[in-house]
Amino acid sequence: MLAASIFRPTLLLCWLAAPWPTQPESLFHSRDRSDLEPSPLRQAKPIADLHAAQRFLSRYGWSGVWAAWGPSPEGPPETPKGAALAEAVRRFQRANALPASGELDAATLAAMNRPRCGVPDMRPPPPSAPPSPPGPPPRARSRRSPRAPLSLSRRGWQPRGYPDGGAAQAFSKRTLSWRLLGEALSSQLSVADQRRIVALAFRMWSEVTPLDFREDLAAPGAAVDIKLGFGRGRHLGCPRAFDGSGQEFAHAWRLGDIHFDDDEHFTPPTSDTGISLLKVAVHEIGHVLGLPHTYRTGSIMQPNYIPQEPAFELDWSDRKAIQKLYGSCEGSFDTAFDWIRKERNQYGEVMVRFSTYFFRNSWYWLYENRNNRTRYGDPIQILTGWPGIPTHNIDAFVHIWTWKRDERYFFQGNQYWRYDSDKDQALTEDEQGKSYPKLISEGFPGIPSPLDTAFYDRRQKLIYFFKESLVFAFDVNRNRVLNSYPKRITEVFPAVIPQNHPFRNIDSAYYSYAYNSIFFFKGNAYWKVVNDKDKQQNSWLPANGLFPKKFISEKWFDVCDVHISTLNM
């Protein structure tokens, strides 16, 4: 961030007058800085007295005085005193689940000394205005809210949101660029590790939002949306100095800048020591995207660093909070299906389990029905998870499951592949030694290709193949199309509400064991097929009728794309 050149003159004088920490240059010889020798770390001064506590409460928004974001031209920042101080302490104590005594006891000071993010927790209330004297009304003031700190540059130098209801701001575009500043790298991790960790942090947000994050090393700095860098004390032209190791470890600014305190001992996510750079980066990116702090247990947006969480993820509330700003992920699927497997429990009994999969382009997601979300870390490349089948644009999946048969097939173009569930790979040949893939016309006579989609109906022991506006019912026992087929999809699967129907070119159709129902997908919408239970409750419903369409994102959550550069993370 190159905002120093446009600081207000008074602020610049305050900055230059402040003591500048002198640090020896961190020595390295390798291009990637893997042999870098970090300079000694500075320690933050503990909060141990009344004055330090007052500064803390003001700095992080707990008092009614805004003094958090850089020196003030009018002199040193005010601090809460007397009754105002006691009330600020009580607010802080309540948020930290401490007895709200209003006294600076040992437990309260300990909470203030915990490592934390530098973004304020609360937006202070506006100062009380004195009564207006009689006379003409005052001239209109600036439209900037009196609650907001002074804007020191085009980037606004203010945090993104507050738990007291202040309006959070969000990016207006969906593709965001980021860059780790080459002049502000960590002295403790290799460049490769830093870039990998930061890219993973962006990916974690991309997995739950329609945002696409891409690393940009070529554009001019001013064109990059989110810039990240490490620094100590006064750093990167920033008006807010870092305090050394032990307290404030990072801060984020509106519209995209994130700074990490290089005096902190940042470590990779696999380490059980230090502060996880991944966890801090995910937190700060949350601020840049518009999320404030919360004291809710389990949230990545808690202001304090929570150790011993090596496998942390964005919880349900964090996901819903960010989706409130950017919306849910929408999109079509090439195919969707439930994968059935047999397992033995602790008593040796055979149990049938299932997992739901969604395929799109060259990626796939496993959907955890019990948690109502995609698996952490998805999507994954089809090439990685399904050896031997086409690596993109799967047309259909069919699982023929009877007392005598347990066969799984993938379809693409004019061919199909059989998949071996036990070996977890596509078969290369059948029992007679004939090679896979095979032509659809040979294995399923009478079925056209390429297909739109297909599914196996266990009730009737039929495969329904869909092609444009037609559906073909295929008898798996006789290996032929039923005599009365093909028929129009609207004839076999009529609309419950007239004209509320996909009509043709269905993207995917599958039977869900989680809902005991058949679903048709087209675009970002789905139609549920009337099942036996529906008919029992409402006998007037047509057999195999389609209920009115709904959005896929309202039933299956967080099936989100990520940038292709992060697919293998």
From Swiss-Prot:
<dbReference type="GO" id="GO:0031012">
    <property type="term" value="C:extracellular matrix"/>
</dbReference>
<feature type="binding site">
    <location>
        <position position="283"/>
    </location>
    <ligand>
        <name>Zn(2+)</name>
    </ligand>
</feature>
<feature type="binding site">
    <location>
        <position position="293"/>
    </location>
    <ligand>
        <name>Zn(2+)</name>
    </ligand>
</feature>
<feature type="propeptide">
    <location>
        <begin position="25"/>
        <end position="144"/>
    </location>
</feature>
<keyword id="KW-0479">Metal-binding</keyword>
<feature type="repeat" description="Hemopexin 3">
    <location>
        <begin position="448"/>
        <end position="496"/>
    </location>
</feature>
<comment type="similarity">
    <text>Belongs to the peptidase M10A family.</text>
</comment>
<dbReference type="InterPro" id="IPR001818">
    <property type="entry name" value="Pept_M10_metallopeptidase"/>
</dbReference>
<keyword id="KW-0325">Glycoprotein</keyword>
<feature type="repeat" description="Hemopexin 4">
    <location>
        <begin position="503"/>
        <end position="559"/>
    </location>
</feature>
<keyword id="KW-1056">Heterotaxy</keyword>
<dbReference type="InterPro" id="IPR002477">
    <property type="entry name" value="Peptidoglycan-bd-like"/>
</dbReference>
<dbReference type="InterPro" id="IPR036365">
    <property type="entry name" value="PGBD-like_sf"/>
</dbReference>
<dbReference type="GO" id="GO:0002244">
    <property type="term" value="P:hematopoietic progenitor cell differentiation"/>
</dbReference>
<feature type="repeat" description="Hemopexin 1">
    <location>
        <begin position="330"/>
        <end position="389"/>
    </location>
</feature>
<feature type="binding site">
    <location>
        <position position="287"/>
    </location>
    <ligand>
        <name>Zn(2+)</name>
    </ligand>
</feature>
<dbReference type="GO" id="GO:0006508">
    <property type="term" value="P:proteolysis"/>
</dbReference>
<keyword id="KW-0677">Repeat</keyword>
<dbReference type="InterPro" id="IPR024079">
    <property type="entry name" value="MetalloPept_cat_dom_sf"/>
</dbReference>
<dbReference type="GO" id="GO:0030198">
    <property type="term" value="P:extracellular matrix organization"/>
</dbReference>
<dbReference type="Pfam" id="PF00413">
    <property type="entry name" value="Peptidase_M10"/>
</dbReference>
<keyword id="KW-0732">Signal</keyword>
<feature type="region of interest" description="Disordered">
    <location>
        <begin position="115"/>
        <end position="166"/>
    </location>
</feature>
<feature type="binding site" description="in inhibited form">
    <location>
        <position position="117"/>
    </location>
    <ligand>
        <name>Zn(2+)</name>
    </ligand>
</feature>
<dbReference type="GO" id="GO:0004222">
    <property type="term" value="F:metalloendopeptidase activity"/>
</dbReference>
<dbReference type="GO" id="GO:0060976">
    <property type="term" value="P:coronary vasculature development"/>
</dbReference>
<feature type="disulfide bond">
    <location>
        <begin position="329"/>
        <end position="560"/>
    </location>
</feature>
<keyword id="KW-1015">Disulfide bond</keyword>
<dbReference type="InterPro" id="IPR018487">
    <property type="entry name" value="Hemopexin-like_repeat"/>
</dbReference>
<feature type="active site">
    <location>
        <position position="284"/>
    </location>
</feature>
<dbReference type="Pfam" id="PF01471">
    <property type="entry name" value="PG_binding_1"/>
</dbReference>
<keyword id="KW-0964">Secreted</keyword>
<feature type="glycosylation site" description="N-linked (GlcNAc...) asparagine">
    <location>
        <position position="372"/>
    </location>
</feature>
<keyword id="KW-0865">Zymogen</keyword>
<dbReference type="GO" id="GO:0030574">
    <property type="term" value="P:collagen catabolic process"/>
</dbReference>
<dbReference type="GO" id="GO:0008270">
    <property type="term" value="F:zinc ion binding"/>
</dbReference>
<feature type="short sequence motif" description="Cysteine switch">
    <location>
        <begin position="115"/>
        <end position="122"/>
    </location>
</feature>
<dbReference type="GO" id="GO:0005576">
    <property type="term" value="C:extracellular region"/>
</dbReference>
<dbReference type="Pfam" id="PF00045">
    <property type="entry name" value="Hemopexin"/>
</dbReference>
<keyword id="KW-0645">Protease</keyword>
<keyword id="KW-0165">Cleavage on pair of basic residues</keyword>
<dbReference type="GO" id="GO:0061371">
    <property type="term" value="P:determination of heart left/right asymmetry"/>
</dbReference>
